[in-house]
Amino acid sequence: MVLVDTCGWIEWLTDGPLADAFRPHLEQTDALLVPTLVQYELAKWITRERDETLALEVIGLTQQSRVVALDTSLALGAAALALEHRLAMADAVIYATARAHDATVVTSDAHFEHLSGVTYLRQQTKPD
C-alpha cells in the first residue's frame, strides 16, 4: 500500500516538476490509501486555487482508492508520532495512517524526509 501526501496530489494536478514521479503511485488505485485529512486538504486547496467543481471531481477520484477516516486509535497514534518526531498535526495524522496500514508515504514534503517508511521525492533546485 502507498499513501501519497497532499503535496503529491497537488504536484500531479498542477503538472509540477515531480508530477511524473507521483503519477504511477496515484494511478494504482487498488494499492492507494487516502486519509480523509488528505481529502480535506485537497478540497480546501483546489477550491481556493481553482474552483469547487474541480475539488469535488478530485475528491471523487480519491474515493476510487481506500479512504481511511480519522478515528481514536489513529488520533492517539498521531499524537505519539507528533511528539516523537516533532510533526505538525496533519503530517502526524498522515504518517500514523500510513503506519497503521503498513503503507509507504510518498511525498516531497521535507518534514517526512528522514522518517522510516517514507519515499521522499526531492524537489530539484534551480541553479542561480
Walk through the language-model features, giving the residues of each.
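A generic structural signal for short hydrophobic patches within well-formed alpha-helices
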Residues: 9-10, 39, 112-113
